[in-house]
UniProtKB/Swiss-Prot annotation:
One of its GO terms (cellular component) is cytoplasm. It is an enzyme of class 2 (transferase). Signal peptide: none annotated. It catalyses: uridine(2552) in 23S rRNA + S-adenosyl-L-methionine = 2'-O-methyluridine(2552) in 23S rRNA + S-adenosyl-L-homocysteine + H(+). NCBIfam families: PRK11188.1. This is Ribosomal RNA large subunit methyltransferase E. It comes from the Bacteria. Transmembrane segments: none annotated. Specifically methylates the uridine in position 2552 of 23S rRNA at the 2'-O position of the ribose in the fully assembled 50S ribosomal subunit. Belongs to the class I-like SAM-binding methyltransferase superfamily. RNA methyltransferase RlmE family. It is found in: Cytoplasm. It comes from Blochmanniella pennsylvanica (strain BPEN).
Length: 208
């Protein structure tokens, strides 16, 4: 069941989408998505990226975050992106199409980046929503746990993690799990995130 109020197939959703100032700005600047502005706002506060870093981008399609990161880490940096959806090629970005919960896909991902060699793990993964809060939040936390597990395998000491999750039951426990791996944990809600959305972004720094 899809909540018709916010369904991407509804005329109401489409009207709001195309009137959105960030959608308009993304179109004007020829960006792939409005999520570029979310990452920019977070990075202005938390300074996640620097030249030469290796970054994993989970839930990368259509490529808004990958393009942003590329502009920050330069030609000496490296981005490995992964999504179940296709993504148009971005020069300098290695894209892996598949579900990162699939052991075969995660094995390829780990092979590409090496053990404890990644500076930042990003996850903008989101579940298909039902409009039923308890289900949507649970699915979001599940994706957050997948991303956190990838951090445990690939993130170097003092590395950083940025993950999108939905607010609701289970978030407090998830925050505790993130705290167990990182010294600094913050919650961000950038202006480009729609006010009615349950999404928040957890910024975790200084992997233990």
């Amino acid at each position: 069941m899809v909540n018709s109020k916010y369904s991407m197939c509804s005329s109401g959703w489409l009207q709001k989408h195309f009137k959105d100032q960030y959608v308009k700005a993304a179109q004007r600047q020829k960006l792939r998505s409005r999520s570029w502005f979310k990452l920019d706002a977070i990075n202005r506060i938390d300074a996640l990226f620097s030249t030469g870093m290796t970054v994993i981008d989970l839930g990368s399609a259509p490529g808004g975050w990958a393009l942003y990161v590329k502009s920050k880490i330069g030609k000496t940096g490296r981005i490995v992106a992964c999504d179940i959806l296709s993504m148009r090629n971005i020069s300098g970005v290695n894209f892996l199409k598949g579900d990162c919960s699939n052991p075969n896909i995660s094995k390829i991902l780990y092979k590409w980046v090496g053990q404890k060699q990644v500076n930042v793990v990003l996850s903008d993964m989101a579940p298909n929503t039902t409009g039923i809060s308890i289900i949507d939040v649970s699915r979001s936390i599940h994706l957050g746990n997948l991303a956190l597990n990838i951090c445990r395998n690939v993130l170097m000491h003092r590395g950083a993690f940025l993950v999108k999750v939905f607010q609701g039951k289970g978030l407090d426990k998830y925050l505790c799990d993130v705290h167990s791996l990182f010294n600094i944990v913050r919650i961000r809600k950038p202006d480009a995130s729609r006010s009615h959305s349950r999404e928040v972004y957890i910024v975790a720094k200084e992997r233990k």
